[in-house]
From Swiss-Prot:
Keywords, ordered alphabetically: Cytoplasm, Nucleus
SUPFAM superfamilies the UniProt entry points to: Ypt/Rab-GAP domain of gyp1p
GO cellular component, one term: nucleus
InterPro entries hit by this protein: Rab-GAP-TBC_dom, Rab-GAP_TBC_sf, Rab_GAP_TBC_domain
Main localization, broad class: cytoplasm
Pfam families listed in its UniProt record: RabGAP-TBC
Entry's Gene Ontology molecular function annotations: GTPase activator activity
Name of the protein this chain belongs to: TBC domain-containing protein C1778.09
Protein's cellular compartments: Cytoplasm; Nucleus
Length: 414
């Protein structure tokens, strides 16, 4: 990285000073930023308008749900009835029962906005508790899960939100927070980073629907800047790329800044995400070629190719943010459950992103199949209002276990 000019150095120092403010609710003395604009703080906003995940309900709605067609999906290659019965008898068919359902079907009795816990979720919480082992390490509790078939199946069904931070940490790190890495985090935040100007631009527009990130230069925005600043310095081969802000913001919803930094480092270095962000985006472009190849085995994918809708045109944000603000937050979390458990640096993360992309596109087949380029891009580029997470996850499971190109029954390919 080239040494910044004196003027740029002054700007970098100015940005750092803004995010190093001490948070005092009684005296929010926010200096004037470089561009002369300060995001207003709406003191009238109430936590009553926040859903169970911390997002303001008014910021996302499904008024455009009518744009998407809701019907059953006859196009997937599903296991034959005999195999499904055998799987059901041994408890391996829980998700496949949803595979015919539309991902846009509103599920009766299920609301992602409500804060109360249903009896079904209470049962699932107890099941996750029974799978968790607790060890005392240096006087601290360490939670861990054995990677069994049961764990994988229950993760496809969704981790209860009260277990999410524990499970994600166990899947990805599985150790106590590294004190040396935490010390390094604070050291890095004392240094100047040439990416700070771009990070500062991206911070206020990342996760803006979440109450944690609503106030400029303080709260979650301050933590987000600090984590991204430290990661860019800690992994110079990656530096900072725009999609990283979405990943860090999601982690900060569940973890303190030090742990979010550790999780971010592990995702980039041990789960293959760093390769997607690396200079030149060679790995990302290869991943798009792989997705295009798999899409060629599906009816909806062939239609996308015919109208010139390339994966790079609609899937870049899907891959680099792991579907953050591409699907509803509750759906994103279900995808992330799989990322932490099944992702890996030897192609597993790319395969999971590929399986998820195929599942989303296949779930929209009747919306896409007769649409022109403009309509297709409109459908794929915004926030896709998925309502039936289980229907999407059932499709992801099918594609994760067997990609279209791996299906030996060529005559059944749609």
């Amino acid at each position: 990285m080239e040494n910044p000019s004196p003027t740029r150095t002054t700007n970098l120092q100015r940005i750092r000073s803004l995010y190093r403010l001490q948070e005092d609710k009684n005296n929010l003395n926010i200096p004037e930023p470089i561009n002369g604009k300060v995001q207003e703080i709406d003191t009238k906003e109430s936590l009553e308008n926040v859903d169970r995940y911390g997002n303001y309900r008014s910021d996302f709605n499904v008024n455009n749900l009518g744009f998407y067609k809701v019907s059953k999906d006859p196009t997937l290659d599903k296991p034959n009835p005999a195999k499904r019965l055998g799987n059901k008898l041994i408890g391996h068919d829980d998700m496949l029962k949803y595979v015919d359902e539309s991902i846009f079907m509103v599920v009766p009795g299920e609301s992602h906005d409500r804060n109360e816990i249903s009896a079904k979720e209470l049962s699932r919480i107890q099941k996750w508790k029974s799978m968790c082992s607790i060890h005392l390490v240096s006087g601290n509790q360490l939670h861990s899960f054995r990677k069994t078939r049961k764990l994988i199946l229950r993760t496809f069904k969704g981790i209860p939100d009260c277990w999410r931070s524990i499970a994600w940490w166990s899947f990805l790190v599985d150790s106590l927070p590294d004190k040396k890495l935490i010390d390094k985090y604070y050291q890095l935040n004392e240094q100047i980073c040439d990416y700070d100007v771009q990070i500062d631009l991206d911070v206020p527009r990342t996760a803006a629907t979440h109450f944690l990130f609503r106030k400029r230069y303080i709260g979650g925005q301050r933590l987000l800047f600090r984590v991204l600043h430290a990661v860019a310095l800690y992994i110079p081969r990656v530096g900072y790329v725009q999609g990283m802000a979405s990943i860090a913001a999601t982690l900060l919803i569940y973890y303190p800044e030090e742990q979010a930094f550790i999780m971010m480092v592990n995702l980039l270095e041990n789960r293959g995400m760093g390769d997607l962000f690396s200079s030149g985006f060679d790995t990302l472009l290869k991943a798009f070629d792989m997705l295009k190849h798999e899409l060629s085995f599906t009816q909806s994918g062939r239609h996308l190719a015919e109208i010139g809708a390339e994966p790079s045109a609609f899937a870049t944000r899907w891959y680099l943010t792991v579907f953050h603000q591409c699907v509803p937050f509750h759906t994103q979390l279900r995808i992330w459950d799989l990322l932490f458990l099944l992702g890996g640096s030897k192609g597993q993360t790319v395969r999971l992103l590929q399986a998820t992309s195929l599942a989303v596109i296949q779930g929209m087949w009747d919306t896409l199949i007769d649409a022109d380029f403009e309509v297709v891009m409109q459908a794929l580029s915004g926030v896709i209002p998925i309502q039936n997470d289980n229907a999407l996850l059932a499709r992801i499971q099918l594609f994760w276990e067997k990609m279209p190109s791996e299906n030996s029954s060529k005559s059944k390919r749609n």
